From Swiss-Prot:
It catalyses: GTP + H2O = GDP + phosphate + H(+). Belongs to the small GTPase superfamily. Ran family. The gene is Rasl2-9. This is GTP-binding nuclear protein Ran, testis-specific isoform. It comes from Rattus norvegicus. GTP-binding protein involved in nucleocytoplasmic transport. Required for the import of protein into the nucleus and also for RNA export. Involved in chromatin condensation and control of cell cycle. The modification N6-succinyllysine is found at K159. Residues 37-45 are annotated as: Switch-I.
Length: 216
C-alpha cells in the first residue's frame, strides 16, 4: 500500500509531421495506447495514453495525434499549448516530408519554446530510401535527437520515448524495465539493412556541418 496516492508521472507529447508519414500507424503499435485513446472533438485530435515501465516507476505519455488535420493547413496553437515534449516525423521515402520538417519545428518552438524534441525518419523498412543519413542535418543544427524508425516492423519503437523520458526526468540512468505490448509486426526489418542504417548514421554524425545557412 506504500505506493498508493503517489502521482503517476505523465507528460503531454505532441506528434507532428506531414500527413502520410505514419504518425497514426506509429501510435497504434502500442496496444494499451490504442485501447485507451480519447478523441478531443474541439481540437480534432486523438490522445493516446502510452505507459512505459521504468526503474523510476511508470511514466505516462499522453500523445496528441493530429488525426490527419495537418492536410488542411497548419495546426491550431491549442494543439501545442502545454506540450512538454514532441516527436517530429518524416517519411524517408519522401523528400518533401523532410523538407517540411523546419516548418513543423518552427511552429513547435513558437508555442512551446524549449522542450525536448525527437526527429524520427519513418519507413526505414522500405529499401527505396529517398532521404539518406548523410543529408539529415536538421537535428544536428537544432540540437534535436534523431532516430530511424519503422512503425510497421516495430523497429526502434521505444527509442524516442526512452530518450524523452530520460530528458524529462533528468536521469541519464533511467531504464525501461519492461517493453510495452506492441502489435505484431506487419513487416520484418532486415537485420543487415538495420545495421547498415545504424552505421551510416554514425558516419554522418562525424561529418562536419556545411557552412551555408540553409534550414536543412
Amino acid at each position: 500500500m506504500a505506493g498508493q496516492g503517489k502521482p503517476q508521472i505523465q507528460f503531454k507529447l505532441v506528434l507532428v509531421g506531414d500527413g502520410g508519414t505514419g504518425k497514426t500507424t506509429f501510435m497504434k503499435r502500442h496496444l494499451t495506447g490504442e485501447f485507451e485513446k480519447e478523441y478531443v472533438a474541439t481540437l480534432g485530435v486523438e490522445v493516446h495514453t502510452l505507459v512505459f515501465h521504468t526503474n523510476r516507476g511508470p511514466i505516462k505519455f499522453n500523445v496528441w495525434d493530429t488525426a490527419g488535420q495537418e492536410k488542411f493547413g497548419g495546426l491550431r496553437d491549442g494543439y501545442y499549448i502545454q506540450a512538454q515534449c514532441a516527436i517530429i516525423m518524416f517519411d524517408v521515402t519522401s523528400r518533401v516530408t523532410y523538407k517540411n520538417v523546419p516548418s513543423w519545428h518552427k511552429d513547435l518552438v513558437r508555442v512551446c519554446e524549449n522542450i525536448p524534441i525527437v526527429l524520427c525518419g519513418n519507413k526505414v523498412d522500405i529499401k527505396d530510401m529517398k532521404v539518406k543519413a548523410k543529408p539529415i542535418l536538421f537535428h544536428r543544427k537544432k540540437n534535436l535527437q534523431y532516430y530511424d524508425i519503422s512503425a510497421k516492423s516495430n523497429y526502434n519503437f521505444e527509442k524516442p520515448f526512452f530518450w524523452l523520458a530520460r530528458k524529462l526526468i533528468g536521469d541519464p540512468n533511467l531504464e525501461f524495465v519492461a517493453m510495452p505490448a506492441l502489435a505484431p509486426p506487419e513487416v520484418v526489418m532486415d537485420p543487415a539493412l538495420a545495421a547498415q542504417y545504424e552505421h551510416d548514421l554514425e558516419v554522418a554524425q562525424t561529418t562536419a556541418l556545411p557552412d551555408e545557412e540553409d534550414d536543412l
